[in-house]
């Protein structure tokens, strides 16, 4: 993997800097590195593809070295370099696609394609120029079963989940009380509602709670907490739990009371915030517990009083909600990130070349299913294919 990264970094620099008119002295070190790459690769043969519709391609390396010059690089010099660069980039692209198409239930973090396994040989260690990539560093740690640490912005840690629970239900669905939620990506939105606006509740207060267990622990998380759940702020028709009928939800938004968010790790409370909104920090957690209250307003103007009558029918439904959004966090496991294209790149390659479903990844790289059942085997394979995708992205946009 380190050799693949060094090849890609060298080729990227060469493509960007070996241009007509450049002083040789400005790129002499790069050209020496480029020549070392050629010397090491010459005389070797590789094969890529042969899985799904990814065609088999054979690669032979027999290139001349780039010479020295006292002056600027001329058109002939650059053209010679370009021919070599383009062949190497095509090779790297195919090695990466071949690797992203493969998976293994055992030691999935190790190279799976024939070409990348060959590049891992001792003879290619002379190409190992640069390992500054965060993904390479973490791949090395994961490969040695040591602690990794990825910094994510908007990590896709929550499997998609959208549902409701009813704490009070009537056959006609005309006087309901409960919670509804939408968890997805890096965001939780949860709403508590009571058609009667806590009319007969103790002290006219309804208590709501929403607990979310993460598939992997996060640390050093920057989080935004808001006293609103905008996705549940408009009318909708909702299918009943048994699918036999539908019920109408027509929310009137109130501000939640006594809001508390707890971050737990292995059942122990690590951080607690009460009635604090905006930016909050969570040190280390694998579970989030949100609790909040709906309080019937003790004093109401006639207009508000008309919204919340003392008896049925209840045309409008009192609703309070919260939004919790993880803006950035550190995780010991590789995850999809809303700010990165790695999952999209891997999925696109596997779809384009009709890669058959293997023993590890779900069909279509379905992220909700993948993260819901995030096994060590999936973690290892994701670590590898995301590392390869990050390398490929240096050369192929």
From Swiss-Prot:
What functional role does this protein have?
Intermediate capsid protein that self assembles to form an icosahedral capsid with a T=13 symmetry, which consists of 230 trimers of VP6, with channels at each of its five-fold vertices. This capsid constitutes the middle concentric layer of the viral mature particle. The innermost VP2 capsid and the intermediate VP6 capsid remain intact following cell entry to protect the dsRNA from degradation and to prevent unfavorable antiviral responses in the host cell during all the replication cycle of the virus.
Could you tell me what this protein is called? Intermediate capsid protein VP6
Q: Where is this region: Interaction with the inner capsid protein VP2?
A: 62-73
The source's superkingdom equals Viruses
Question: What is stated as this protein's family in its record?
Answer: Belongs to the rotavirus VP6 family.
- Tell me one GO biological process term: fusion of virus membrane with host plasma membrane
Q: Which InterPro entries match?
A: Capsid_hemagglutn, Rotavirus_A/C_VP6, Virus_capsid_a-hlx_vir
A GO-annotated cellular component? viral envelope
Task: Give binding positions for Zn(2+).
Answer: 153
The record's GO molecular-function terms, alphabetically, read: host cell surface receptor binding; metal ion binding; structural molecule activity
Residue numbers binding Ca(2+): 266, 286
**Signal peptide coordinates:** none
Q: What organism does the UniProt record list as the source?
A: Rotavirus A (isolate RVA/Human/United States/WI61/1983/G9P1A[8])
Keywords noted in UniProt: Calcium, Capsid protein, Intermediate capsid protein, Metal-binding, Ubl conjugation, Virion, Zinc
The primary site where this protein sits is virion
Give compartment(s): Virion
- Other observations noted: The VP6 trimer contains a zinc ion located at the center of the molecule. The zinc ion is not essential for either trimerization or transcription activity of the DLP. Zinc-depleted VP6 has an increased sensitivity to proteases.
């Amino acid at each position: 993997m380190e050799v693949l990264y060094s090849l890609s970094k060298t080729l990227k620099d060469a493509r960007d800097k070996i241009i007509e008119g450049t002083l040789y002295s400005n790129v002499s070190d790069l050209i020496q590195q480029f020549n070392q790459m050629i010397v090491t690769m010459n005389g070797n043969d590789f094969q890529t593809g042969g899985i799904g519709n990814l065609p088999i391609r054979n690669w032979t390396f027999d290139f001349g070295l780039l010479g020295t010059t006292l002056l600027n690089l001329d058109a002939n010099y650059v053209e010679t370099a370009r021919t070599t660069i383009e062949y190497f980039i095509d090779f790297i692209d195919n090695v990466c696609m071949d690797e992203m198409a493969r998976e293994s239930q055992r030691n999935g973090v190790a190279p799976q394609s024939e070409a990348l396994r060959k590049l891992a040989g001792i003879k290619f260690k002379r190409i190992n120029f640069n390992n500054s990539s965060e993904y390479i560093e973490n791949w090395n740690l994961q490969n040695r079963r040591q602690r990794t640490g990825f910094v994510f912005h908007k990590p896709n840690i929550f499997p998609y989940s959208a549902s409701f629970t009813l704490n009070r239900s009537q056959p006609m669905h005309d006087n309901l009380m409960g919670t509804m939620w939408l968890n997805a990506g890096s965001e939780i939105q949860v709403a508590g509602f009571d058609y009667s606006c806590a009319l007969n509740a103790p002290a006219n207060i309804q208590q709501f709670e929403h607990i979310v267990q993460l598939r992997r622990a996060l640390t050093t998380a920057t989080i935004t907490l808001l006293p609103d759940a905008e996705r549940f702020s408009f009318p909708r028709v909702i299918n009943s739990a048994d699918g036999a009928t539908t019920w109408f939800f027509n929310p009137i938004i109130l501000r939640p009371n006594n809001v508390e968010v707890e971050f737990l790790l292995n059942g122990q409370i690590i951080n607690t915030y009460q009635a604090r909104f905006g930016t909050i920090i969570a040190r280390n957690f694998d579970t989030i517990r949100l609790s909040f209250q709906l309080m019937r307003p003790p004093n109401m103007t006639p207009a508000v009083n008309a919204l919340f009558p003392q008896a049925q029918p209840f045309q409008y439904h009192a609703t309070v909600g919260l939004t919790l959004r993880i803006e950035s966090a550190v995780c010991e496991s590789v995850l999809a990130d809303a700010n990165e294209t790695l999952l999209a790149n891997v999925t696109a390659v596997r779809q384009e070349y009709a890669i058959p479903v293997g023993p590890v990844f779900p069909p279509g790289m379905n992220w909700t299913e993948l993260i819901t059942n995030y096994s060590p085997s999936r973690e290892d394979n994701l670590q590898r294919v995301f590392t390869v995708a990050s390398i490929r992205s240096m050369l192929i946009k």
